[in-house]
């Protein structure tokens, strides 16, 4: 069983912002596998389904980004999911737009949502899909809560689809295979 968590902030004002990429990827997976994310529990919205023979729980925490660990630990404990089977998808400023990076473990890298998840799990050993949003020329908060330009949106739509495929690959083939397949790929206009 896998817990697939997309990080983001709830509310219309955050829809399609850089910081909500995790929500967008979870929505793509939900659509592909006909999973309705309409149940409220674990301080978030979630749905249950299958990828092949594996049961998956798709989770969108409603705690706001910096407290995402509260939602993740509640769902993981309820379903008794191993940390190695918790996949977290989130935006990453240290990666260029058009790229993603799959990792099996690691530090928070300055991302407060990941920092909170690491604290609650008491471990940094869980797979993650880091989606590049590029470096801001402006205030970081305004940048991550801002929307993509038209040109960026064209690239991001393709990266979101690739990120969903990377999550599916982790479930079907394992994190190492997903890393080999998706790390280093760059999508351009």
UniProtKB/Swiss-Prot annotation:
One Pfam family matching this protein: Pept_tRNA_hydro
Localization in the cell: Cytoplasm
Record keywords: Cytoplasm, Hydrolase, RNA-binding, tRNA-binding
Broadest EC class assigned to this enzyme: hydrolase
Residues that bind tRNA: 14, 64, 66, 112
Reactions it catalyzes: an N-acyl-L-alpha-aminoacyl-tRNA + H2O = an N-acyl-L-amino acid + a tRNA + H(+)
Principal subcellular localization: cytoplasm
Role: Hydrolyzes ribosome-free peptidyl-tRNAs (with 1 or more amino acids incorporated), which drop off the ribosome during protein synthesis, or as a result of ribosome stalling.
Subunit structure: Monomer.
Protein name (Swiss-Prot/TrEMBL): Peptidyl-tRNA hydrolase
Organismal lineage: Bacteria, Bacillati, Bacillota, Clostridia, Eubacteriales
């Amino acid at each position: 069983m896998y817990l697939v968590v997309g990080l983001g902030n709830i509310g219309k004002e955050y829809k399609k912002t850089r910081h909500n990429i995790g929500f967008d990827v979870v929505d793509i997976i939900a659509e592909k596998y006909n999973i309705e994310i309409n149940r409220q529990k674990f301080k978030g919205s979630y749905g249950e389904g299958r990828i092949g023979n594996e049961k998956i729980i798709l989770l969108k925490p409603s705690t706001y980004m910096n407290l995402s660990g509260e939602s993740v630990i509640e769902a993981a404990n309820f379903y008794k999911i191993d940390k190695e089977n918790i996949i977290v998808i989130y935006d990453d400023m240290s990666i260029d737009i058009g790229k993603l990076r799959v990792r099996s473990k690691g530090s928070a890298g300055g991302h407060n949502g990941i920092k909170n998840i690491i604290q609650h799990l008491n471990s940094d050993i869980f797979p993650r899909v880091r989606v590049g949003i590029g470096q801001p020329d402006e205030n970081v908060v305004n940048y991550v809560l801002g929307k993509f330009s038209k040109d960026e949106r064209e690239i991001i739509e393709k990266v979101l689809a690739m990120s969903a495929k990377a999550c599916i690959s982790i479930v079907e083939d394992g994190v190492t295979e997903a890393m080999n397949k998706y790390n280093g790929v760059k999508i351009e206009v």
